[in-house]
Each structure stands twice: as C-alpha cells, then as structure tokens.
C-alpha cells in the first residue's frame, strides 16, 4: 500500500509508489476525508499565529541598543527558526487541500520540504543548546558563558541543520503517483539500497534520540540543583530572575518534547513497516494517518513558544509593554484649565 503522505516529514519513496503484488487495504476514507477538509484550515491558523507570535518575540529580543544575553541569543534563534518554518506551511495546507497533488512545481517542492526538514534538526539542536546553557548557569555557575561562544554555537547549529536537509533537496521531485490517478505529487525518491536505515538513523537517532538524551541529562541535573531553592517556588510570582528564566526554559523544553515525540514514534513505526518488521493493513493505516496528525501536532510547537513567553515570562511581558509604548503614537500633552482660560481671555480682548 502506498503512503498517502508525500511531504518531507511523511516521505514517500520510489519503492512505495507501485509495490508489486501489494495487498490492497481499506485506507479509512472517512479519516482521510476529514483530514483533507479540516487540517488545511488548522495549518493556516497555526501559520498566522506562529508568524505573528515569532515576529513579536524577535521584535522584543532584537530591540535596538540592547545586548542579548546567552539564553536570549538561543531563544532568538529558535524564534527565527520557527518563523522560517511557518512560512512554508501554507504550501503544505494547499497540498493537503488538493489531496496531495502538488501544484507549485519542482523548485518549491524541494525548497519547502528542505526548509521543513532543516527546521526539524535546528529546533531540537537549539533546545539542547538552551538546556546546556541553563545547566551551566545553575549547576556550574562559575563556568564562563560567553556570547561569542553562543554565536558560534548558533551558526554551527544552522549549518548542521542545513547539511542534514541536503538529501531532501537532492531526492525530492515531482512524480506521477498511480495511487493519485497518475497526478503529480511531491515525493521523496530515495536511491535503492539501505536508505531506509540511513534515513532512520538521521531522523530518529540524530534528530531525536541523541538530542533527547542530552536534554534529559541537562534538565535532570537542573531540577536536582534547584530542588528546595526558594527562587524556584517564587519563579512565577516575582522571584529572582534566574529562577524565572529557568521556569521559562523548562516550559519550553517540556512543550517541545510533548509536541514532537508523537511524530518520531510514528516515523520509527514507518521504518518498521518499510523493512517489514511490522506488517498488515491495520499498521499501514495506523502509520499513515498517525504520521499526518502527529506532524500537525508538531507544527503547534512553532506557535506555542510565543504563548509560553507571554504566560511564563514576566520580564517578556514587561518588554512587550515597553515596545508597545515606544511604537504607539504619543498623545499631545494635556493643557491645564488655567492655560485655556488665559488663551480665551486673550482671544476676547482682541
């Protein structure tokens, strides 16, 4: 059975297009019809919220005459990554609304999916860097945290994410898919061989399991070091800035893991079906639909971070208000009644 998911997070490769002697499965038409009708609108809402929210975060963090600290530097890069990511979502929404028939040509097929794939790696690598920075600040407070090192780390993360998305740029193309009545779809045409294993190692191991191990290590040590500290209990009600920053970072990490873990579970399940460790129509349908819905659940993370800023970051709310006052048109100074009276007297005297 061919996959119904031709975009990058949900790849379709050459061996899946027309499998010989494949068993025909009932592919849950009601569930797919619901997906085609509902999810494009949901994606557009996510795109608009993510665009406005991340622009607000960048506007606050990158205000003129203000130097970013190390944590803010990582958070600004995370907002920039999410912003680039949501710019590609309208193409995805149109593709799903069109029942996976790609109408935008080969260049955008590669570009949109490459950006999505790069963001997957850049986001989780930045979460690792953010967790490591909090770990050094709280567990090893005497260690130096230099802005130059943070800038170099951010550049390295963007380069690494871009390099890991190179296979997407190389192997994405427009292909006539029999399961779509030979209409054109944006598919991932992997070369023959052990590519399934290579992709699983890249996506699930480099893109999730290894970063997850680092995130768990850093945050477990952070929680252990904060246990019993009064600033943790006061972090949400005016406690010391260090405690509030830690609460913000931990909320970011928790939201990221909650949003992205289901996708990686279904991506690994797809690998098991591709190598035929897991077989049967139930698992095919479960995997295909699960990948779609888990992907959109992961999309929510790109517009969730600004919400976390507003509700958890008290200092961020203060800076938003300062930015609003700076940008809002200034009202003319109020004129006292005595001044008005003098003006009227001069007017009538003349």
UniProtKB/Swiss-Prot annotation:
Keyword Cell cycle set for record: no
A biological process term (GO) from this entry: response to lipopolysaccharide
Glycosylation sites: 13, 21, 95, 182
Organism: Canis lupus familiaris (Dog)
One GO CC term, this protein: plasma membrane
PROSITE patterns: G_PROTEIN_RECEP_F1_2 (PS50262)
Disulfide bonds: 109-186
Annotated membrane topology: Multi-pass membrane protein
Extracellular-side segments: 1-41, 94-110, 172-204, 270-292
GO molecular function: bradykinin receptor activity; peptide binding
Subcellular location: Cell membrane
Ranges annotated as spanning the membrane: 42-62, 73-93, 111-131, 151-171, 205-225, 249-269, 293-313
UniProt keyword annotation of Lipid metabolism present: no
InterPro entries according to UniProt: Brdyknn_1_rcpt, Brdyknn_rcpt, CCR1-9-like, GPCR_Rhodpsn, GPCR_Rhodpsn_7TM
Family in the record: Belongs to the G-protein coupled receptor 1 family. Bradykinin receptor subfamily. BDKRB1 sub-subfamily.
Source domain of life: Eukaryota
Cytoplasmic side, ranges: 63-72, 132-150, 226-248, 314-350
Function, in words: This is a receptor for bradykinin. Could be a factor in chronic pain and inflammation.
One Pfam family recorded for the sequence: 7tm_1
Annotated lipid attachment (S-palmitoyl cysteine): 327
Protein name: B1 bradykinin receptor
């Amino acid at each position: 059975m061919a996959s119904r998911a031709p975009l990058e997070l949900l790849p379709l490769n050459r061996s899946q297009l027309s499998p010989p002697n494949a068993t025909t499965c009932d592919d849950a038409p009601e569930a797919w019809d619901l997906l085609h009708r509902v999810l494009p609108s949901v994606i557009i809402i996510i795109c608009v919220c993510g665009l406005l929210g991340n622009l607000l975060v960048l506007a606050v963090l990158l205000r003129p005459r203000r130097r970013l600290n190390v944590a803010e530097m990582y958070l600004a890069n995370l907002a920039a990554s999410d912003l680039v990511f949501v710019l590609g979502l309208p193409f995805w929404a149109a593709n799903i609304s069109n029942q996976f028939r790609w109408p935008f040509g080969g260049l955008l097929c590669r570009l949109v999916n490459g950006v999505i794939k790069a963001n997957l790696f850049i986001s989780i690598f930045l979460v690792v860097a953010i967790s490591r920075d909090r770990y050094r600040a709280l567990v090893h407070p005497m260690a130096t945290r230099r802005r130059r090192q943070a800038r170099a780390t951010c550049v390295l993360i963007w380069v690494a994410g871009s390099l890991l998305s190179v296979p997407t740029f190389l192997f994405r193309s427009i292909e006539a898919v029999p399961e779509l009545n030979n209409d054109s779809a944006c598919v991932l045409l992997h070369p023959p061989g052990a590519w399934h294993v290579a992709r699983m190692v890249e996506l699930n191991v480099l893109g999730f399991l290894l970063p997850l191990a680092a995130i768990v290590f850093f945050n477990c040590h952070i929680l252990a070091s904060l246990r019993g500290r009064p600033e943790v209990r006061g972090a949400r009600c005016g406690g010391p800035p260090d405690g509030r920053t830690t609460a913000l970072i931990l909320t970011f990490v928790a939201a990221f893991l909650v949003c992205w873990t289901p996708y990686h579970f279904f991506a690994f399940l797809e690998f098991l079906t591709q190598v035929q460790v897991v077989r049967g129509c139930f698992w095919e349908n479960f995997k295909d639909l699960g990948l779609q819905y888990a992907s959109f659940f992961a999309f929510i993370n790109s517009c969730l971070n600004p919400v976390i800023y507003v509700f958890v970051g008290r200092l961020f709310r203060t800076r938003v208000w300062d930015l609003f006052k700076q940008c809002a048109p200034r009202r003319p100074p109020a004129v006292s009644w005595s001044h008005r009276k003098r003006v009227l007297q001069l007017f009538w005297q003349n």
